[in-house]
């Protein structure tokens, strides 16, 4: 059985380069503005018997909707199991429709300011919510999507 999760970034970027400082500032700004502990989210699918996950999301750092394979260490990421029937197939189909679409910075700000973003661009929690079939996906921050789905899985299990 394919294990699908909402992965929520709670980590703190380390480093002192201008790029790393900018990323840290942006993570902090998202957490403050949304009054939450998360600054980003992904739909994560366990990848075989490794510690890696196939992660689907819209990312400002990566330029828009993309798939990325990466580990999700428990000190930086919380995982909430998605127990939706056919969730994996739904995610794959939605990704096929939206892959490569640009990041929606104005839409991400709109979660806080109440303004609409672009219908042709995506921000992380909007993309994840839409892929899961949530109504009005553009209204969700990473924290609000986590609250909607439930509490993070505390004990990670190998699948």
Where do the language-model regions lie?
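Cysteine-nucleophile amide-bond enzymes
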Residues: 1-159
């Amino acid at each position: 059985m394919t294990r699908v999760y909402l992965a929520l970034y709670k980590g703190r970027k380390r480093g002192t380069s201008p790029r790393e400082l900018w990323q840290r500032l942006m993570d902090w700004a998202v957490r403050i503005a949304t009054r939450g502990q998360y600054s980003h989210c992904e739909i994560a699918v366990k990848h075989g018997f490794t510690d890696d996950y196939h992660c689907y999301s819209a990312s400002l750092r990566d330029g828009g909707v993309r798939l990325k394979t990466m580990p999700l260490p428990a000190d930086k990421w919380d995982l909430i199991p998605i127990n939706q029937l056919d969730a994996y197939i739904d995610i794959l189909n939605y990704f096929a429709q939206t892959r490569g679409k640009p990041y929606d910075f104005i839409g991400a700000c709109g979660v806080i300011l109440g303004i609409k973003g672009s219908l042709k661009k995506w921000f992380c929690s909007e993309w994840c919510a839409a892929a899961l079939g949530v109504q009005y996906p553009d209204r969700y921050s990473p924290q609000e999507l986590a609250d909607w789905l439930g509490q993070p899985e505390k004990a990670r299990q190998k699948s």
